[in-house]
Amino acid sequence: MEAVRCRRGRENNKSPERIIRSLNHHQHDEELEEEVKTKKPIFRRVQVVYYLTRNGHLEHPHFIEVISPVNQPLRLRDVMNRLTILRGKCMTSQYAWSCKRSYRNGFVWNDLAENDVIYPSDCAEYVLKGSEITDKFQEVHVNRPLSGSIQEAPKSRLLRSKLKPQNRTASFDDAELYVGEEEEEEDGEYELYEEKTSYTSSTTPQSRCSRGVSTETMESTEQKPNLTKTEQDLQVRSDSSDLTRSNPVVKPRRHEVSTRVEDGDPVEPGSGRGSMWLQMISCGHIATKYYAPSVMNPRQKEENLRKGVLCKNIVKKTVVDDEREMIRFMSENPRFGNPQAEEKEYFSGSIVESVSQERVTAEPSLRRSNSFNEERSKIVEMAKETKKKEERSMAKVKCIPRTCLMSSSKQIKK
């Protein structure tokens, strides 16, 4: 109760002056608040002319009006905001801007940033220029990877061209190895055949007797066997390389065929012995390349080995018999009896001695007499008869009974 009385006493003790001051202060504050609420910023419209430059040439001028506050100078930011509204966002980023400004007795272009003030040229005239941005560093940076790719392209081509022949040589070497494995097993059979051909070529009438006629015939006869051998080798290599390039999956089949050859079923490419091998295939001794490999028991493998050994022995015997027949034929023929004696040929009744080997110059060829042609035709007939005999002997070895095979295998084991 006492506290309330004190407060009332204080309020009653206030002077009227203090009351008037407080009222005036409140009124002034209210007026200021009303002025702030009712007060609006005052803007102005500024006329701006701008040019655009492309390829170093000024285009026709453009005119715009920019709104800016009266108490602030015109800035480039205000113009850019207006341009983005009128012509899009890319307009401002594609050009570098500068304003026309009086300098001494003339005018200059003053480069501007975004927050820089635009100075008027004459009184209140604002002129701007927008020039295309040319970043040389960006052009160089863009051109460098292109030049690098252009330079890398020939390098990559060179590397590819170097790698391709290596791959080709690798496949070719594989083919040569495969052919070499097949040829190693057939060397024993080819040696006898080569000895026979060398002996017949050294004792033929064309190799010695035709020297007096012309040197061209002698060279052609000597080069024919070499050419045939080289042609056969090239054919085998080309076939093997083509197979490796076209069908790289054929390698396991080749390996299977090589294992079969090692087991005792040789496959020989000879043309004279083709008929015999076809007959053997018909009997069931040899499996062709194109069939899938079948699972064989150890007993069947041993039988196949024995059959292969017997086939090889029979072929060797036939070759030896053929050589003996050729030797007998050559010994019976008087023309091949004395190869070291002086050789003479008859041409229309006149005798022409053989020319020595030291003479290299080619002489004009002479026509051979009828007697020589008759002798040559006889030789050809005899050769045909021998071939027929060979074919007959090969046909006899068509199928071998198993009893003979078992007996021969027992003899081999002994």
Curated annotation (Swiss-Prot):
Renumbered ranges of motif Association to cell membranes: 283-284
Molecular function GO labels: protein homodimerization activity
Inducing or repressing factors: Epigenetically down-regulated by vernalization. Not regulated by SUF4.
Membrane topology according to the record: Peripheral membrane protein
Subcellular location: Cell membrane
Gene Ontology BP term (one): cell division
Compositionally biased residues, Acidic residues: 173-192
Start-end of Basic and acidic residues biased regions: 230-242
Region listing for Disordered, in residue ranges: 171-273
A GO CC annotation given for this chain: basal plasma membrane
Pfam families the UniProt entry points to: SOK (PF06136)
Organ and tissue specificity: Expressed during embryogenesis and in roots.
Family: Belongs to the SOSEKI family.
Assembly behavior: Homodimer. Forms long polymer filaments with other SOKs proteins polymers (e.g. SOK1, SOK2, SOK3 and SOK4) crucial for polar localization and biological activity. Binds to ANGUSTIFOLIA (AN).
PANTHER family: PROTEIN SOSEKI 2 (PTHR31083:SF18), UPSTREAM OF FLC PROTEIN (DUF966) (PTHR31083)
Comment on protein domains: The DIX-like oligomerization domain is required for polymerization, edge localization and biological activity.
Function: Part of a three-gene cluster containing FLC, UFC and DFC, which is coordinately regulated in response to vernalization. Also regulated by FLX. SOSEKI proteins (SOK1-5) locally interpret global polarity cues and can influence cell division orientation to coordinate cell polarization relative to body axes, probably by guiding ANGUSTIFOLIA (AN) polarized localization.
Name this polypeptide is given: Protein SOSEKI 2
Source organism: Arabidopsis thaliana
Lineage of source species: Eukaryota, Viridiplantae, Streptophyta, Embryophyta, Tracheophyta
Chain's gene name: SOK2
